[in-house]
Structure formats: C-alpha cells, structure tokens
Amino acid sequence: MASVFGKPRAGGGQQSAPLEVNLAILGRRGAGKSALTVKFLTRRFISEYDPNLEDTYSSEETVDHQPVHLRVMDTADLDTPRNCERYLNWAHAFLVVYSVDSRQSFEGSSSYLELLALHAKETQRSFPALLLGNKLDMAQYRQVTQAEGAALAGRFGCLFFEVSACLDFEHVQHVFHEAVREARRELEKNSLARPLFISEERAVHHQAPLTARHGLASCTFNTLSTTSLKEMPAVAQAKLVTVKSSRAQSKRKAPTLTLLKGFKIF
C-alpha cells in the first residue's frame, strides 16, 4: 500500500509497527527551514512561503529497512527562540538550520543549540541535534565557512551537514534520515533503561516552565552567556557532508502534497 509521503511499503508478510519519531526544525527566519521541509516531503523547491506559518507534517518513511512514521514540525520563530516548550516537550530530535550566506542565521543557530543544551541539563536527558548549513548553492556569497560550522557542531557534540534545498533531494533526504537514526538510538537507549516494575507510588514533582526557572522571557537567548551552560557531551566527532550540485532525478514517484497550506510550489 502506497503512503502519502515517502517510500511505499512492500507488500506481503507481517509488517512491524512503524517507529514514531517527532522532528523539530529550528532556525532563524530566512534560514530555509520550510524549503528543506517541502523538499524532503515533495522533492520540490518552493520560492515563496509565509514565514509566520508553523505546521506539522507527517511522512511514512523507510529507514534502514524499518518503517517510520515521521512527524516534522516546521517552526516559525522569527529571530530568537520563543515559546519553546511547544517543541522542546514534543520532539525526539532537532534539526538546527542556518544559511551559509548569513552570519546572523549562524549566530541564531548557536542560540538554539544553547537552548537544547540547557534543556538537556534541566531534564537530565539527551536530545539528538543535527546542525545543517543550508543554501550551499549560494556558496559564492559565503559568510560562514565549513570550518566554523564543523567547530560549532563539535562544541555541542552534534552531526554537521551542508546542503542546498533547491538542488539535490537525495542529500536532503539523507539528513532527515540521519535525524531519524539519531532519535531511534536515543529511544532504544531510553527503553532499555526504563524499569520493568514500580514497587511503590512516588510523588510527582512538577517543575516550573523553563523560562520561569531561569528568568528568561519567552525563551529568548540574546543575553544568555554560553559560559553559563553545560554543553551537551560530544558523543562523536562532528561529521561534515558537503553536497555538490546534482540534477540527477530519483526514479521514485513524487508523492502528493496534501498539508502544505500557504506554500507556492513550483
């Protein structure tokens, strides 16, 4: 049976239940978050979209021969992280996006990684994050070098990629599937660590919202010092993937888009 998005599932035999993964796309306005999301879901590149539109999309994917029900939240923060509990408490993994031709968007991505590090420290949990330099097709106007991107990713212990949403679908798909793999590893680790029995009832302590505990207004991190944060432990060296221009088209039939309201698709 064919899926709405992603690869159709093979027929015959008993299918295992799909893994459910929630992925939040973070970054400053103009970094290309919506373009990446639409490219992944439809193989198409959009030239116009509403920067204030935030929505969540679903895609049936197959990653490493395992069915995955992937939900992608295309967030609509403007210039700084705001009302961040909506995705911090929802996502299993995060894709932090900046544009290689914008120093401001790169600095904004650092704020998002700091936010995730603080959230991990407060919750005593690990949240996989991938740093993505977008608009590689604009490399002649670079303001952020590959080395700077790799250094920032290494500082927070996350994977690093550079892609272009308008050029190559396969590499964009690879990044999203890597996010699924990172989330799956973390989910499996948490599942193994979960106790099998609860011997006694324990009082549940409700923590105050992230902003209230740290005196932060709407999760804005403009004045947050990086030295006050305990960075996420580096589980692996930052990996750099540089995507070159490619016009090769995949043979997979382009899926039908049903949820992308407010986009002008070409």
Curated annotation (Swiss-Prot):
- UniProt KW keywords: GTP-binding, Hydrolase, Nucleotide-binding
Please write the reaction equations for the catalytic activity of this protein.
Answer: GTP + H2O = GDP + phosphate + H(+)
Q: Name one GO cellular component term.
A: plasma membrane
Q: Name one Pfam family in it.
A: Ras
Q: Which domain of life is it from?
A: Eukaryota
For this protein, what is the EC number?
3.6.5.2
**Do you know which SUPFAM superfamilies this protein is assigned to?**
P-loop containing nucleoside triphosphate hydrolases (SSF52540)
InterPro entries from the xrefs? P-loop_NTPase, Ras-related_GTPase, Small_GTP-bd, Small_GTPase
Query: Could you tell me one molecular function GO term of this UniProt entry?
Result: GTP binding
Identify the SMART domains for this entry. Answer: RAB, RAS, RHO
Binding-site list for GTP: 27-34, 74-78, 134-137
Span of the secretion signal?
none
* PANTHER family per the UniProt record, alphabetical: RAS-LIKE FAMILY MEMBER 11
Q: Give the family per the record.
A: Belongs to the small GTPase superfamily. Ras family.
What this protein is called in its record is Ras-like protein family member 12
Q: Which organism is it from?
A: Bos taurus
